[in-house]
């Protein structure tokens, strides 16, 4: 079997849609896929760990990396910077591993400009009321922050049509199954299978069964 370049999956959602929980559930299944860890200039939340959730750096370090063109995409959100390592993405895809990239729609457009065949997946909440409830349940966010996130959510939701797939995250187990099905379907596409199994196909087409 021949190794093919990895597939880049972009997953986006408004804050509170449950994207992070969905991605964590996917990784816990043991799926053969690498999660891209973004760089950020914001402070870590109590439960977050450097190198696992984000690469936490100072604003000065982030701006230096930005000037040195180290990011495939970058964006400012709620006064903090976020960016994806260009070198890591290229090396991982070249090795044949699939990558899951958690970014917003602004970053997704930047990535698709470089990787137009990237597979876009957008996660929707079942309703705006559920989205607001999820945001209010976050103890670390102030009322002002929740209001900002709700306003940003409406803007983010307007870009759902730019993606290849849409998942409704009402029940986590159902959303997880949908996400796994998308990845499996992409891996079985003819273009990739022809490269992976060209030896088998060549053997089958030249060997007589009689």
Curated annotation (Swiss-Prot):
SUPFAM superfamilies: P-loop containing nucleoside triphosphate hydrolases (SSF52540). ATP binds at residues 13-20. It is found in: Cytoplasm. Keywords: ATP-binding, Cytoplasm, Kinase, Nucleotide-binding, Transferase. Its EC number is 2.7.4.8. The keyword Nucleotide-binding applies. It catalyses: GMP + ATP = GDP + ADP. SMART domains: GuKc. It comes from the Bacteria. InterPro entries: GK/Ca_channel_bsu, Guanylate_kin-like_dom, Guanylate_kinase, Guanylate_kinase_CS, P-loop_NTPase. Residues 6-184 form the Guanylate kinase-like domain. The keyword Kinase applies. GO terms for molecular function: ATP binding; guanylate kinase activity. One of its GO terms (cellular component) is cytosol. Belongs to the guanylate kinase family. NCBIfam families: guanyl_kin. Essential for recycling GMP and indirectly, cGMP. This is Guanylate kinase. It comes from Nitrosospira multiformis (strain ATCC 25196 / NCIMB 11849 / C 71).
């Amino acid at each position: 079997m021949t190794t093919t370049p990895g597939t880049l999956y972009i997953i986006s959602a408004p804050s509170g849609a449950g994207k992070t929980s969905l991605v964590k559930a996917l990784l816990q299944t043991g799926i053969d896929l690498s999660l891209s860890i973004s760089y950020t200039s914001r402070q870590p939340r109590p439960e977050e760990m450097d190198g696992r959730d984000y690469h936490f750096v100072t604003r000065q370090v982030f701006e230096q990396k930005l000037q040195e063109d180290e990011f495939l995409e970058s964006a400012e959100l709620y006064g903090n910077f976020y960016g994806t390592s260009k070198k890591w993405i290229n090396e991982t895809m070249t090795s044949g591993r699939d990558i899951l990239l958690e970014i917003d729609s602004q970053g997704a457009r930047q990535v698709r400009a470089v990787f137009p065949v990237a597979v876009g997946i957008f996660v929707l909440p079942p309703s705006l009321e559920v989205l607001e409830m999820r945001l209010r349940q976050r103890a670390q966010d102030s009322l002002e922050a929740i209001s900002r996130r709700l306003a940003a959510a409406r803007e983010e939701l307007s870009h759902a049509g730019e993606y290849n797939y849409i998942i409704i995250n009402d029940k986590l187990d159902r959303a997880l199954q949908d996400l796994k099905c998308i990845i499996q379907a992409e891996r079985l596409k003819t273009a990739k299978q022809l490269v992976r199994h060209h030896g088998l196909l060549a053997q089958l087409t030249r060997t007589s069964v009689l």
